[in-house]
Amino acid sequence: MRVKRGFSAHRRHKKYLEMAKGFRGGRSRLYRTAREAVERSLVYAYIGRKQRKREFRKLWILRINAGAREHGLSYSKMMAGLSQAGIMLNRKILAELAVKQKEDFAKLVEIAKNQVH
């Protein structure tokens, strides 16, 4: 029996057009441009997942540095002091403390200061 490919082609087209929902113009309506746009968007999404980790780490370091400098200590000295004191808090938590719980962060800065000086 002869196999025609209309069903599978239609399903494939539908899959890409579903993924292209919300794109502007022909990118959401025309199969070929929609497929190209979707494939490119998936590449950007993959790259973005890697960049997000780097960006958040940068943001956390920036916030910790700003909080530490308010109390007269640099980021690197603070991290060294906390390490010497045996305080193992990650940058995400430290940044959270620096922004939302300034008193607790100030105590950590004092501990780090005592270790460094």
Swiss-Prot record:
- RNA-binding as UniProt keyword: yes
User: Could you confirm whether the keyword rRNA-binding appears in this record?
Assistant: yes
Pfam families xref list: Ribosomal_L20
Positions of disulphide bridges: none
> Which SUPFAM superfamilies does the protein's record reference?
Ribosomal protein L20
GO BP annotations listed: ribosomal large subunit assembly; translation
Q: Name one GO cellular component term.
A: ribosome
One example GO MF annotation: rRNA binding
Which keywords belong to this entry? Ribonucleoprotein, Ribosomal protein, RNA-binding, rRNA-binding
State the family named in the UniProt similarity comment for this chain: Belongs to the bacterial ribosomal protein bL20 family.
Function noted in UniProt: Binds directly to 23S ribosomal RNA and is necessary for the in vitro assembly process of the 50S ribosomal subunit. It is not involved in the protein synthesizing functions of that subunit.
Protein name stated in the entry: Large ribosomal subunit protein bL20
Can you name the source organism?
Lawsonia intracellularis (strain PHE/MN1-00)
